[in-house]
Amino acid sequence: MLAVFDLDDTLVDRSSAIRRWAQLLVGREGMSADAIGAIVGIDRDGAAPRDEFLAVVHSLPGMRMTVTELRNWYAGSYLSCYGVEDESIRALTTLRAARWKIGVVTNGSQERTTEKLTHAGLAPLIDALCVAAEVGVPKPDRRIFDEVARRCGVELSGWMIGDAPVEDIGGGAQAGLRTAWLRRGRRWDGEVPPPDIEADSVLEAVATILNADQRINTW
């Protein structure tokens, strides 16, 4: 069986990482504490292109670095804001013990994705990684799901676990996967058909998936 995971705010806590980075920057530059929330908002959950994000951050009151200095400092400091993801390690270890294949599909960059997985302690637990920039198509395109299944050496059948309604849940469902949505304090908004299950954590999602699989196998 195949379990496909999103990366940011699914396997790794990106929201906390960008807030940690904002705190580091504000402390370094002596900026107002209010700038932390502003920086997190400018990031838009990672949707803001990095050059745009850093240009707007540079315009905030109290910034002393030049744009180039800020870019270089971001490149050297951001990934250090990610830590070991104990809960995700437990979830993936449980799946592997049950002989599931584990794939990761992300629209992020290849270099940063690999480094995030390493920082989180997840790299040894993953069978295949598909990054949109490397594969040539982003989620929710079915082809990136086909590719992660191919790299795992299994048919495209199983589950997609993620936090993004369109890219993860909509894309996974269109690819024929069952879907698990990580709520992150939100309610389902009906933008695409609802997920098969909702959960508050990766560990909860995996436990529910394994219970569902066990029930199917005992029928």
Kindly give the residue locations of the regions a language model identified.
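N-terminal helical cap/lid subdomain that shapes the substrate entry/recognition surface
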Residues: 1-90
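Asp-based, Mg2+/Mn2+-dependent phosphohydrolase catalytic module
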Residues: 1, 89, 93-96, 101-105, ...
